[in-house]
């Protein structure tokens, strides 16, 4: 007789992950900043306008502040959930993913900020978090996210 494995519990709430998914997807579809005074076209200047990070971006700042306010276990779960959604493991390997995420976080000089920077550096963060929740059998769109 085959026993079903219990689905692990997340330290971070569905509402918090849903909020981040929504914000990350908003961020992904934003218009890219353009330097109107550059005087060249994107092909000639190696598309540097596209590569520049606009640190004044309020959406990125909001996401960073929100993630920095999460506790250590919640941040670890976000990284592991992103990896799960990216296909770096399966739900059966959840504890291994969490352990790897904790080891990565503990290797940082400033774990809270560097974990946030790592997550924000993932171009498909919202999609991967949504897929990760889906692997848990959790829908992020059940209701409006209010963390």
Regions found by a protein language model. Give the residues of each.
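Exposed alpha-helical structural elements
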Residues: 16-19, 62, 93-96, 114-115, ...
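Aromatic-anchored, charged helix-turn/loop surface patch used as a conserved interaction hotspot
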Residues: 4-78, 83, 105
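Helix-rich interaction surfaces within compact, conserved domain-sized segments
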Residues: 104-147
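Long, solvent-exposed non-transmembrane regions
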Residues: 2, 25, 110-112
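Short coil/turn segments at secondary-structure boundaries
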Residues: 35-36, 80, 93-95, 143-147
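Polar alpha-helical coiled-coil and adjacent low-complexity
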Residues: 2, 62, 138-141
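Amphipathic protein-protein interaction modules
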Residues: 71-116
């Amino acid at each position: 007789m085959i026993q079903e494995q219990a689905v692990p519990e997340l330290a971070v709430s569905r509402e918090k992950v849903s909020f981040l998914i929504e914000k990350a997807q908003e961020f992904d579809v934003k218009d890219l900043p353009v330097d109107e005074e550059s005087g060249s076209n994107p092909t000639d200047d190696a598309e540097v306008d596209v590569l520049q990070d606009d640190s004044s971006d309020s959406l990125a700042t909001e996401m960073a502040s929100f993630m920095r306010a999460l506790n250590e276990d919640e941040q670890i779960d976000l990284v592991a959930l992103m990896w799960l959604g990216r296909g770096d493991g399966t739900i059966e390997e959840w504890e291994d993913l969490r352990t790897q995420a904790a080891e990565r976080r503990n290797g940082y000089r400033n774990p809270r900020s560097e974990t946030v920077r790592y997550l924000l550096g993932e171009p498909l963060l919202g999609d991967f978090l949504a897929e990760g929740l889906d692997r848990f059998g959790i829908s992020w769109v059940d209701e409006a996210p209010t963390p």
